[in-house]
Design a protein with these regions (language model features):
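Active-site-adjacent structural elements in enzyme catalytic cores
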Residues: 1-211
Length: 211
């Protein structure tokens, strides 16, 4: 049975978030709000938790997981970022964009793409997500909370509680989130490639839905 934390969306209570972080440190999976949709998250260094994350989400190791980072400085510790890529990142962070980049040695091989050695990274613009990351002191491993066999992310914390209370260790309820996943941009090759149109406007990066 999961623990349920109801927090203020702009000024989350530190006491409750500290309890959620303790659960993450202990290897638990949590459902948390972000600026795009609710996400399933776990501690980056916990192998068993990462396997559980994939199992709950219903994806294999070829599905890009995402690192939620506090800022671009932290992101650059986990991905190889050149000057051109950094300028693009600055245009769209923080915000509902996920960038696929080549992972550094700081990223465990088991959570990066098995053949490409890439990883999704983003800097969310949500007070609760940022507060959790600050308390944890490192990125969270994440995936959009889309139930297996479905195409839309979950938005209602009560529905998440009903459907996932036996699967996740913690649910952080900050009210409804947007129902769109992030816009995914692949920066691991020569130029930016729009992989998925989501909540973030690709025009910020000079891209269109036809790119």
């Amino acid at each position: 049975m999961s623990q349920y934390f109801e927090v203020h969306p702009q000024n989350p209570q530190p006491r409750l978030l500290k309890q959620a972080v303790q659960i993450l440190h202990g290897g638990g999976i949590a459902a948390i709000p972000t600026d795009s949709s609710y996400a399933l998250v776990c501690h980056l260094d916990d192998k068993a938790a990462a396997e559980s994350l994939r199992r709950i989400r219903g994806v294999d190791d070829k599905h890009h997981l995402t690192l939620l980072c506090r800022d671009l400085s932290e992101l650059a510790s986990y991905a190889r970022v050149d000057n051109k890529q950094y300028r693009l990142l600055k245009l769209a962070t923080p915000g509902p964009y996920t960038f696929i980049l080549e992972a550094t040695k700081e990223v465990p091989r088991r959570v990066s793409h098995p053949s490409r050695r890439t990883i999704g990274l983003r800097v969310p613009q949500h007070a609760v997500t940022q507060a959790l990351l600050e308390l944890l002191g490192q990125p969270l491993l994440a995936t959009t909370l889309i139930p297996p066999g479905e195409t839309e992310p979950l938005n209602d914390p009560q529905e998440i509680r009903e459907r996932f209370q036996k699967s996740v260790a913690a649910i952080v309820d900050a009210g409804a989130c947007p129902m769109q996943p992030t816009t995914v941009i692949d920066l691991s090759n020569d130029g930016p490639i729009l992989v998925r149109q989501g909540r973030g406007d690709p025009a910020v990066l000079g891209l269109s839905a036809d790119s």
